Amino acid sequence: SSAASDVYKRQTLAELANKSAEANGFETFLHFENCNIFEHKDDFCSFAHVVSNPPYSENDLPSPNPSKATAHNYKQAGLAEWIRFCIKMIRPQGYFYMINRAEALEDILAVLHGKLGEITIIPLYSKEGQTAKRVIVRARKDSKAPLIIRQPLIIHQADGSYSKEAYAVLREGAVLD
């Protein structure tokens, strides 16, 4: 059995991810499958960590790139349904993680309210002095701990290179608290 599982809606992406895991020696504990999460009824309450990077918009400006258009727009279900599905997949005391647009935060928190606690919000700023375009939300099942807003993670320096903190997370595997 895998230590980590991931699902992709597109078969080609699942295959590519499995090939990458194998090429890097991770095939014994990483597994990627092709399925529609809303039709995937197995494994309820079985994951310690559920990480989600859902489509960002119901009607985002469509990209000319079909892969990006699919990734950015949810057509089958809205964000609330997506989050409720993720919550079902988390085992007791498990964690939920999501990255999404900052303007979706109110909707995300509304779905989490009363279901998950220990909610932590990390605003993501493209550059210092700008407002958050994305947020990372972490929450825990069966927790009543209060909401925490962390310091923002600034992704790029003025010259466009990664900030020290972002580089550590993206390239060195540092953990966001």
Task: Give the ranges of each region predicted by the language model.
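Mobile active-site "lid"/loop adjacent to the S-adenosyl-L-methionine
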Residues: C45, P54-E81
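A short acidic, Gly/Pro-enriched loop at the edge of an enzyme's catalytic core
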Residues: E39-V50
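Conserved SAM/SAH-binding beta-strand->alpha-helix loop
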Residues: R10-T12
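SAM/dcSAM-binding transferase cores
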Residues: T131-D177
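Conserved SAM-binding strand-loop segment of SAM-dependent methyltransferases
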Residues: G25-I37
